[in-house]
């Protein structure tokens, strides 16, 4: 593989694993408060990742969940997003306009992002 940087990949995984404790705290808090459903929000590559996460979760869990393309959600909305919805997203830059607007809309619709 050209330009493959093994150390960069290892560092990336290790950084993600270092967040596990904090992620578990957040999940425990959400479970204690209760939730209705989970929405994976993405655009482009992060939407593709959201679809993969959705498929994996459906395979292992009965939790109500779905994936939304951020641009479509901003344009058309989704009646399933509201109070009790947990929105999970990832963003490479944190400034993709569709994602920024999608987060604002989800919050306005009553979801926890």
Specify the residue positions occupied by each region the protein language model found.
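Glycine-rich phosphate-binding loops that contact phosphosugars or nucleotide phosphates
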Residues: 33-113
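Cofactor-/ligand-binding subdomain signature composed of acidic, glycine-rich
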Residues: 1-32
């Amino acid at each position: 593989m050209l330009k493959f940087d093994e150390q960069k990949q290892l560092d990336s995984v290790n950084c993600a694993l270092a967040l596990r404790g904090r992620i578990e705290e957040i999940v425990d808090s959400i479970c204690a408060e209760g939730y209705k459903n989970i929405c994976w929000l993405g655009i482009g590559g992060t939407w593709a990742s959201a679809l993969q996460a959705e498929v994996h979760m459906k395979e292992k869990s009965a939790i109500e969940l779905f994936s939304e393309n951020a641009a479509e959600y901003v344009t058309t909305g989704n009646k399933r997003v509201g109070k009790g919805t947990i929105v999970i997203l990832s963003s490479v830059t944190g400034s993709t306009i569709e994602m920024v607007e999608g987060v604002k809309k989800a919050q306005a619709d009553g979801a926890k992002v």
